[in-house]
Amino acid sequence: MGHHSCCNKQKVKRGLWSPEEDEKLINYINSYGHGCWSSVPKHAGTYTHIHGFCLQRCGKSCRLRWINYLRPDLKRGSFSPQEAALIIELHSILGNRWAQIAKHLPGRTDNEVKNFWNSSIKKKLMSHHHHGHHHHHLSSMASLLTNLPYHNGFNPTTVDDESSRFMSNIITNTNPNFITPSHLSLPSPHVMTPLMFPTSREGDFKFLTTNNPNQSHHHDNNHYNNLDILSPTPTINNHHQPSLSSCPHDNNLQWPALPDFPASTISGFQETLQDYDDANKLNVFVTPFNDNAKKLLCGEVLEGKVLSSSSPISQDHGLFLPTTYNFQMTSTSDHQHHHRVDSYINHMIIPSSSSSSPISCGQYVIT
């Protein structure tokens, strides 16, 4: 840092000011004013009966000594909280322009403001930022969000439930094979139509109904209403059940391919095969893994119909007929349009191994 030209002259004193020097400077400025600071040491240092001997100080040193220590309007003592807040606000605008900041603080010098900033305010701000400011900000935001009104039915307590439903809908719309049992629901029986359970164009399966209200069967604590389904049916894992929560009335509805099951699970299922004994067509009911039964290729399948057990059957093949169960469904919920049908879905799944079916052997379809 360079020195003023007057400081390079000889007989210029540096360092601490003595009380005599302070008195000479105060007496001169009170009598004549400071004017040009470069001329103050010369006039103040003239030997007179008033000022005594000259000051051996440069003009800059006289100015700083007067402004920072000797002026009568100088405000001494600690900074008030109002002054500290004003300094923080001005510093955010002006930065380290201490002289500009000091102009807004009567009686405070730029050097005093700078020292107060570096020694007190800056340290407190840094400590507050690292330890308490972040938590205070989060608490303020939390209280603000807590006090906000719920618009359009939004409630922070239901965010997790809504997110779960949203993700479930994404999974449902993306891959139906990953639907959980909690999403399985069906409309009331009076709105269920065959279109909701479409058959293949080759007529592999058909959704059968009956009007006999006297027949009922209890299974898995669920009641089924007037629904005839082929039996026996397997009990599969509920983690990968398809959903029937919304089935559009579309004749061209394509069912997705469902996962395979081991042979031991489906060994009890019956299949309807067609054989020809000379000119007579026989309806043969065998299981896929029945070693004693005669395994023949599938012939013509009647479109939209299930082969009836009243057709002529050959007793030489050791045949057995599929049985049907009638389950009575009673609604125990106030919501008549949707029911939980986890067990019902289990009884609606039967195998298909018809070579003419678009769904290949070993897969399951919902009838």
UniProtKB/Swiss-Prot annotation:
Point out the DNA-binding stretch(es).
37-70, 98-121
Q: Which UniProt keywords apply?
A: DNA-binding, Nucleus, Repeat, Transcription, Transcription regulation
Where is the HTH myb-type domain positioned along the sequence?
9-70, 71-125
Matches recorded under PROSITE patterns: HTH_MYB (PS51294)
Q: Name one GO biological process term.
A: plant-type secondary cell wall biogenesis
Phenotypic effect of disruption: Male sterility due to a defect in anther dehiscence. Fertile pollen.
Induction data: Down-regulated by auxin.
Location relative to the cell: Nucleus
Q: Which Gene3D superfamilies does UniProt cross-reference here?
A: Homeodomain-like (1.10.10.60)
- Supply the SUPFAM superfamilies for this chain: Homeodomain-like
Task: State the Gene Ontology terms under molecular function.
Answer: DNA binding; DNA-binding transcription factor activity
Q: Name one GO cellular component term.
A: nucleus
* Tissue-specificity statement: Highly expressed in flowers.
Q: Function, please? A: Probable transcription factor that regulates lignified secondary cell wall thickening of the anther endocethium, which is necessary for anther dehiscence. May play a role in specifying early endothecial cell development by regulating a number of genes linked to secondary thickening such as NST1 and NST2. Acts upstream of the lignin biosynthesis pathway.
Which PANTHER family is this protein grouped with?
A: MYB DOMAIN PROTEIN 55, TRANSCRIPTION FACTOR MYB26
Q: What is this protein called?
A: Transcription factor MYB26
